[in-house]
Amino acid sequence: MSGPLRKHHPLLKVVNHSVIDLPVPSNISVMWNFGSLLGLCLVSQILTGLFLAMHYTADVNLAFSSVAHICRDVNYGWLLRNLHANGASFMFICLYMHIGRGLYYGSYFYVETWNIGVMLLVLTMATAFLGYVLPWGQMSFWGATVITNLFSAIPYFGPDLVQWLWGGFSVDNATLTRFFAFHFFLPFMIAGLSVVHLLFLHQTGANNPTGLAGDVDKVPFHAYFSYKDVVGFVVLLAGLVFIALFSPNLLTDPENYIPANPLVTPVHIQPEWYFLFAYAILRSIPNKLGGVVALAMSIVVLFFMPFVHSSRQTSHNFRPLAQVLFWLMVVNVLLLTWLGGQPVEYPYIFLGQAASVIYFVNILLFIPIVGYVENKLLFS
């Protein structure tokens, strides 16, 4: 058979159609780099996590000591732990940038790709939460207690569900063991779902900044965008290594360097920084069930994006009114992130409630109204 091997070999042609001869709109910007950066983060997390798992012990009496042992006695264990802990932060930075790009340029019109992406977000958040419990420090233990306790708000079978999750009547050895098992398993599930995400993306082709059909001007992915992705890889890895070497505790909670003690509650229980926006929404509602519903809806609302978009234009590029709403949403999420780390007192309670209302009203009410107004102004 004539032609390059990559074009007719059963395995290589799949790779060829995905990353070599894939037709890509020629005008996609650096904002389209975050998908590949997420792939790099996932590979990095799986590799560092695999080596950490070789030395970690999932037992309430030994977990904290085993993490200390990794950092002190294992060759480059301190580096593996720092890369893994900070790699999670970098992964969420890329994830939120990737979602932000999708919202700005209307990528949610590729409904299957978008919905699988939101599922990937939920799985990644679950994986990160499970991983935060494993060092068995104070914030690990109390974070696990508080978050799993939220399931007790589910009517009728909530309390039984919580005991089933715990494997007993409190967060204990059974909880830690199962959390470790799921933390090990879920990244591979994320990797599998990412392949499905790419499969659906390549069925429709990539979006582009204009929001118009990009079929008129496409170029092969390699070498135009493969080298562009490599530049992103270098920048991301340089940033990750810099943080891991020079300021490894910049993004972590010092409370987690205290071994877990069920008899002493930390002054302020809070999750890692990348969950603070959702935590602020949870805290803003004084009712337990209402808070849990609001927390779930803060992520589920992303599924509604294709339905609340009423404008005849896909991208925000040429929609000044919609751009104002988009940046309002970005600033609001940053404000919620800050509020989630503040104590539960005035004025933070009121500000959290106001920001939570703005978050939902902006997506479910303002976005469709502004789209309708723009249609009237531009096309009527």
From Swiss-Prot:
The biological process GO terms on file are:
mitochondrial electron transport, ubiquinol to cytochrome c
Record keywords: Glycosyltransferase included?
A: no
The alphabetized UniProt keywords are: Electron transport, Heme, Iron, Membrane, Metal-binding, Mitochondrion, Mitochondrion inner membrane, Respiratory chain, Transmembrane, Transmembrane helix, Transport, Ubiquinone
Cofactor binding note of this UniProt entry? Binds 2 heme b groups non-covalently.
GO CC terms in record: mitochondrial inner membrane; respiratory chain complex III
Q: Which family does it belong to?
A: Belongs to the cytochrome b family.
The record lists a ubiquinone as bound by 202
- What is the source species? Branchiostoma lanceolatum (Common lancelet)
Gene symbol? MT-CYB
Q: Which residues bind heme b b562?
A: 84, 183
For molecular function, the Gene Ontology terms on record are: metal ion binding; ubiquinol-cytochrome-c reductase activity
Principal place of residence: mitochondrion
Assembly information from the UniProt record: The cytochrome bc1 complex contains 3 respiratory subunits (MT-CYB, CYC1 and UQCRFS1), 2 core proteins (UQCRC1 and UQCRC2) and probably 6 low-molecular weight proteins.
Q: What name has this protein been given in UniProt? A: Cytochrome b
* Keyword Nucleotide-binding tagged: no
Q: Check the record and name the InterPro entries matching this protein.
A: Cyt_b/b6_C, Cyt_b/b6_C_sf, Cyt_b/b6_N, Cytb/b6-like_sf, Cytochrome_b, Cytochrome_b_C_euk/bac, Cytochrome_b_N_euk/bac, Di-haem_cyt_TM
**Ligand binding (heme b b566):** 98, 197
Note the SS bond partners: none
**Membrane topology listed for this record:** Multi-pass membrane protein
Miscellaneous note, as given in the UniProt record, is: Heme 1 (or BL or b562) is low-potential and absorbs at about 562 nm, and heme 2 (or BH or b566) is high-potential and absorbs at about 566 nm.
Cell compartment(s), UniProt: Mitochondrion inner membrane
